[in-house]
Amino acid sequence: MAPTMGVDDLLASPQDDRSPTLLEKDLILAAEVGQALLEKNEELASQIMQMESEMEAMQQEKHMVQRRLEVRDLEASQREAELQADISALRAQLEQKHIQGRDRRREESEQLIQLSNHNQKLVEQLAEAVSLEHTLRTELRTLREEMEDTSFSKSISSARLDSLQAENRVLKERCTHMDERLKSTQEDNERLRSERDGLRERAIELQTSLKDKETELEQEHSTVFQLRTVNRTLQQRVQALGEEASLGEATCFPLSLQSEIQQCQAKETILAHSSVLREKEEEIQRLQKELQSRETELEGLREEVKLFRNSPGKPTYKALEEEMILARQERDALNQQLLNTIRHKVALSQEVESWQEDMRLVICQQVQLQQQEKEKENNKERTGFQRGTRTTKSLRLRGEEGRKGFFSALFGGD
């Protein structure tokens, strides 16, 4: 592969004696280099144009920024002028306020002197009021002592009333408790009455069935007795027949056959009666067992009724009614006592209210007298104070008129 050559080599290449292939390669290479240089030149030209457009945009932006800066400078100068004008106006107002403050302090000093004089007079009046208050307190102390004497009896009655109210509350609670207890006992009594009626019916049924069983048992006993007697007679007859058979073996054949037949019939009747007797005895035993169970059940019911009647924890209905009557009588008595106490308390409160009304009237009269005296003194002081303010106002008006005359003369001369 041929080495790369520059532009100078290409220009100097015609002077060399080379082969036409090398010359052709050099020309191709020169064309490629020229093409690359043209592309590079175009790229640089486009970059230059872009930079020029950016430069123009920056110049326009710079121009706009300069214009904004000039506008801001103009606004700042106007704002500064306005602020300077405001500062000068505020300084003038401050100077005016200083002047007004000096005038006000002068007036306040004068008013303070007048108020100190007025305060001195008020101190003297306060001393008089304190002495008057001391006398009123002594009178009030005596009145309080009298009131304590009356309130002592009132407190005793109120304490008694409180105790009676507490007792009444306790009795009411007891009454409600007794009502609840009575209600529960009534419910228990109703339940027990129903149970008792059921037990009575059950006992009556058991007694009737027991009587029926006893009658049946007596009948069975009688039948058993009859069967036993029949059995005994039959056994006696059998024994007699056996004896006759053993003694009369020597008799004729028909007689022995007839006796055997009679003996067999007697044995059959004895066996039938014994089976019937056995059945009757079994039925008697069954009836005796049933009778014994019914007797035990009846005895249990009697024990339950006896326990209910003799139980100390469950009071009877009559005792509960007596206790309720006593509680109601006690409640009525306490209510009557409470009403009497309330009436007595109302009478005492009316007496205390009338006494307090008298005291209030006396105190109001004394306070009105004090207020009238204070109003008289205040009116005197107001008249003196108004005279002083009128003199100061007249002097101030005269000074202002002198100033106006001076300024009018000054401007008129100009």
From Swiss-Prot:
Coiled-coil zones: 34-341
Keywords: Coiled coil
Tagged with keyword Coiled coil: yes
Positions of region (Disordered): 372-399
Compositional bias (Basic and acidic residues): 372-384
Biological-process GO terms, alphabetical: Golgi to secretory granule transport; vesicle transport along microtubule
InterPro entries: Spindly/BICDR_Dynein_Adapter
Name used for this protein in its record: BICD family-like cargo adapter 2
Gene Ontology, cellular component aspect: cytoplasm
